[in-house]
Amino acid sequence: MEHICKESVAALRDYINSHLPGTIHAVDDQKDIEHPLNYPYTSPCSGHKFREFYYWDTYFTCLGLVHLDRWDMILNNIKNCFDLIDKFGYVPNYNRYHGCNRSQPPFLVNLVDLYYRHTGDLEFLQEGVEHLEKELVFWYNQRSFENGLAHYGYQLRPRAESLAFYEMINRTRVPYPLEDEEEKLQAAYQFYAEAESGWDFNPRFDHKALEYAALDLNCNLYAYEAMLAQFHMLLENPEKASQWQKRAEERKARMNQKMLDKESGLFLDYSVALDQRSSCFSLASYFPLYQGLATQEQAEDAVKALPRFLYPYGLSTCEKAEHSVTYQWDYPNGWPPLQIVVVRGLLRYGYVQEANTAAEAFLTNVIKNFEESGHLWEKYNVVEGSLNVSNEYELPIMLGWAAAAALEMMDVLGL
């Protein structure tokens, strides 16, 4: 890439190689964590901020660990997910009390697939299948509408605790002033569900995440069903493979019926309560490519929509629009995991030039701010190439998925 200096890439890679291992926590480094893990684990940051085990952060961190050849830590992270499923029935948002009344976007099937393709270990795959199926029971029984599509949600907590959660979010994260206590309680439940999406907080659901079939979630669950079909064939269980393939096809059909916007050609979040698709265009529309659900024609429509999101320094989380509230999962913020989803999704469908353009834009942003600050960050302004982002809390120095995105973009660009 003529626009990216090789020396800058080398310096960033050296920084990641030396600092990413600093996010690994030993088993005995959990004395104040209510739900300690049985294996070493990675956290999003080094130091004391965000030092817990976060579900979807862990998946993207593992994509970075691949480039460091740290398969031992990838396996440790997977085993921790297995143990959490055995304990809760799902992988919590994070392993403290306040993170355990919800999950996060489920990516364990992608991790199991990643590790199996590296090792060919059928015993591991069998254990993985058992835990993936157990996790799906949670998503089916506690996070699904009658039409079979899934939504984000929460596990019930004491009334006073939920009211306190509402007050905290309203005061420090997203202004949503209410007077009636029952309305505050219902708002807290919606905030919990939106936190489960990982995109806390965003304009996609209009503060009604419980009412929406979430696009990214249903794409991920489709991947579970489709990959479980493949796994069962590898394990010589053709009958079970057929059952899972049928579930995958049924979900895909429902999504095409309810979530595909004919005008734009994009899949969108779908309000079951209103029986209509969301008017918010976001990078969630690239999950059908990342998880292999889209047809080639649908992928082409997603490529045509890239100008809604692509800026000189990466992909904006949502299309620019006016909102009464400032969200951090919105324009002009570019979040590292979503850059990976879009770029890898484009490559999956053969759009190499478009993937390279997006990868170069975001890597340029990361390098620019690394050279100015000496750090990687949780999110970036993709319009300016700066750290002038919409925040709901102080912008944290980040390794985890920021390092992973940088390494993935380098890999895509052959740097």
Locate the predicted segments by residue.
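Extended glycan-interaction surfaces of carbohydrate-active proteins
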Residues: 2-52, 76-95, 148-212, 250-334, ...
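Short amphipathic alpha-helical coiled-coil/interface segments
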Residues: 132-135, 241-259, 359-362
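Alpha-helical support elements that line or immediately flank enzyme active sites
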Residues: 54-84, 284-295, 339-352
